Every structure is written in structure tokens, then in C-alpha cells.
């Protein structure tokens, strides 16, 4: 009975890293979408005084600056996540069995 428990435990161990990786990726996507929403709201509140038919030069410059900072920040975050992903081998447990 113990051998069947240990073999099913090792089978689950082989699936867990894949599932964990999938969950991490989906969580990162969700966080990124939340960040886009927050930055859109922040830039709108910061830069848009009165909605009108045309942006004035101050509002336009503000939006450009806000979006550029968002892109810089997003690129930094993506690079950091990529470094984190590379430093964690996904299938290391299944290869050692």
C-alpha cells in the first residue's frame, strides 16, 4: 500500500511544477492588466482637467510623459520577470526522477 502512495505522490510531483508555472504566468498576466488599468486611470486623473473636443498642449504633454513612464516601468517589470523565470528551472524535479 505504501508503494502505491509513493508512486502516486511522485506522479503528482511531476505535474505540480507545470501547474505552478501556469498559475504563475496567469497571475503575472492578471497583475499586468491591473497595472494597465491603474495607470490609465492615474494618467487620466492627472492629465485631464476638462474633457473637450481636443487636447490642449499641456494635457497632451502630460499624457505622453505618463505613457512613456508606463512603458519604461512595464519594460523594467517584464525584464525582471524574465530574469526570475530563467533562474527557476520548471522541470527540474521530473528530470531527477
UniProtKB/Swiss-Prot annotation:
The modification Phosphoserine is found at residues 57, 87, 94, 96. It is a peripheral membrane protein. SUPFAM superfamilies: Tim10-like. Keywords: Chaperone, Disulfide bond, Membrane, Metal-binding, Mitochondrion, Mitochondrion inner membrane, Phosphoprotein, Protein transport, Translocation, Transport, Zinc. It is found in: Mitochondrion inner membrane. Mitochondrial intermembrane chaperone that participates in the import and insertion of some multi-pass transmembrane proteins into the mitochondrial inner membrane. Also required for the transfer of beta-barrel precursors from the TOM complex to the sorting and assembly machinery (SAM complex) of the outer membrane. Acts as a chaperone-like protein that protects the hydrophobic precursors from aggregation and guide them through the mitochondrial intermembrane space. This is Mitochondrial import inner membrane translocase subunit Tim8 A. It comes from Mus musculus (Mouse). The lineage of its organism: Eukaryota, Metazoa, Chordata, Craniata, Vertebrata. The gene is Timm8a1.
